[in-house]
Amino acid sequence: LCYTKLDFIYYGRKCGYTMNFEERKKLLAEWKQSHLLRFYEQLNDEEKQILLSQIDGIDWSFEQAFSHESKSKDSLIEEIDALQLEKILADQEHYRSVGLQAIRDGKLCLLLLAGGQGTRLGFDKPKGCFNVGLTKELYIFQLLIEHIMDVVRAADAYIPLYIMTSNINYQDTITFFEAHDYFGYDASYVHFFIQEMNPATDFGGKILLKSKYEVALSPNGNGGWFSSMHKAGLLDAIFDSNLEWINVFAVDNVLQRIADPVFLGATIASGKMSGAKVVKKAFPEEKVGVMCKENGKPHIIEYYEMTDEMLTKRTADGNLAYGFGAILNYLFPISRLKETLDESMPLHVVKKKVPYVDESGNPVTPSEPNAFKFETLALDLIHKMDDCLIFEVDREKEFAPIKNSTGVDSVETARELLIKNGYTL
């Protein structure tokens, strides 16, 4: 067996071993990150402990994103078949029956990805706390819970709901739910946890300091939620239960159907390992990740990775061959997810603006991207599945994302769709 430096670090953490100061200095020197202790002697005892604790918690796997150059691999990209609306509508009562029974039998739990802030909406709170109402209060979190409650009433059974926050909005999110009595949901079924963080680095790979005693950390992307649940100590209870499926969804689509018994029932009936809700692309160049197959396995290809030929290719019936956009609403089998805990996830490097302190300890707020962030993506989790039911939904009824304050995918467009679907705002 060949063990790496990372293996020994993670084994030590698993055994509860805490490094002393000299061991930390040696570790940082080996990773060429000794500058993290630059201001150590200027700190008080509490600040020293915060810094050392953050250093102990660094996931050093981000270094592999630098050491492994991106290399072209032989990939066969093919279109993927979907269960389309016409077929779903014809069999929906059967699918609904199968799905509701699975929910009654305690086979389904839910995961809400709610780490985002409402910054792009001009709102300095968790995005889920944003009020989309015009004449009354109607919050994003409220709408999502109401969608789940529709299923709870139909199944006569509550569904465990896990809510992943960031370290920034964790307490604000809990306080908001408590202040609104969980919008009628049984609080004993709701579990909050914090998304894991990765350090941000400058373009030379040096980890940035947010302050003299804080590492610059950022959320690890939308693909790392299962390891974050593991770190939060939530998985033992899940593994010991009857739960078989987890429905993962994002906070910003206010029309989506969550715990959808038709989606669940169709996925179970198909015999496929996983499921993904999709919408038909509005036009070939729409900026949305598209479901396809890569080397025979389910995959999401980003719009900017598609060739002109792929963008415009059509099937015999005239539809786009690569025409189903993923909307971040998935069904994953817990048994397969358990196996992924022992498997690595690719890290994607993105350029972002990250505030930091310079060598003199002065705070700097950059006006241009100055740093790398390292993220795992849900599309890589999809690719770990043997197969996937591509489940089409009506975008006018289930796709109203809120990403901007105005324009495309905005509060304005979401309000229009809510009104169109009978909501009083």
Which residue stretches match the model-derived regions?
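Short, Lys/Arg-enriched N-terminal segments with co-localized hydrophobic residues
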Residues: 1-18
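N-terminal glycine-rich phosphate-binding loop and ensuing alpha1 helix
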Residues: 21-190, 199, 210-226, 235, ...
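Conserved structured core elements
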Residues: 104, 111, 123, 135-142, ...
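Structural beta-sheet core signal
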Residues: 110-112, 163, 192, 248, ...
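Fold-independent oxyanion-binding glycine-rich loops
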Residues: 115, 166-167, 195-196, 231-232, ...
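Short acidic, glycine/serine/threonine-rich loops at helix termini
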Residues: 122-125, 172-178, 202-207, 258-262, ...
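Conserved beta-loop-beta/alpha segment of the NTase-like Rossmann-fold superfamily
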Residues: 187-286
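Catalytic core of tubulin tyrosine ligase-like
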Residues: 242-247, 255-259, 264-424
